């Protein structure tokens, strides 16, 4: 199945999205306003600019590798290729634009094909620390819009592609349910503050933040272990069937 191309026009220089002359909102702005308003409050603008430029460069060299087979000498580009090989990622497209054609639009870093109707979405992160909660919301919104734009298609996996120097990890992310994403968008459209059902309130009964992060990591590791165990079983059964058919 071929993916549907959005009619929304993306101006890369101004980073704006327009449809029939009407400007749509990007996803990053909504996430910042509704969920992570103080994420970079104490970071100097010069540092943010430098990080953004570095991130853009790494995105570009990875895209060159995917689209043109041009292998850049940077460590991140080499590590990205290593991750693709290790996990058997079947590249479909980069910067895939998705939209509800009314309010929101955004470009997905990476789309990988799992089957004729199943896809995985990846987002490249180059930060010092990987903010899994941020990328969870980002990719979940992408998944919702992706399936809306491509009826019959299913997003089966979401993952962050963490590339920073010698760090290269593919981190699978749990999807936020669609009904929660719908509520988030409705709040943004109405000019209301979204109530995050996953937010942790400070109190005597809550675990310290570092233990909460450890607990979340354990959950994600278990989910990844289950996925690859299922894949191993699927491949093993396939080999056995071929051996039986061949009379081995």
Which role does the model predict for each range below?
Residues 1-107, 113, 230, 237:
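Metal-dependent nuclease catalytic cores that hydrolyze phosphodiester bonds in DNA/RNA
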Residues 13-15, 117, 166:
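Beta-strand-connecting loop/turn residues
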Residues 46-48, 127-130:
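A short glycine/serine-rich beta->alpha loop
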Residues 58-59, 106-128, 142, 221:
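Conserved catalytic cores of phosphodiester-cleaving nucleases, focusing on short active-site segments
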Residues 89, 117-119, 155:
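A general structural motif
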Residues 93, 121-123, 159-160:
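A structural signal for short, well-ordered beta-strand segments and their strand-loop junctions
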Residues 100, 131-133, 144-247:
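Metal-dependent nuclease catalytic regions and adjoining charged, substrate-binding loops involved
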Residues 135-138:
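Short, conserved glycine- and acidic-residue-centered signature motifs
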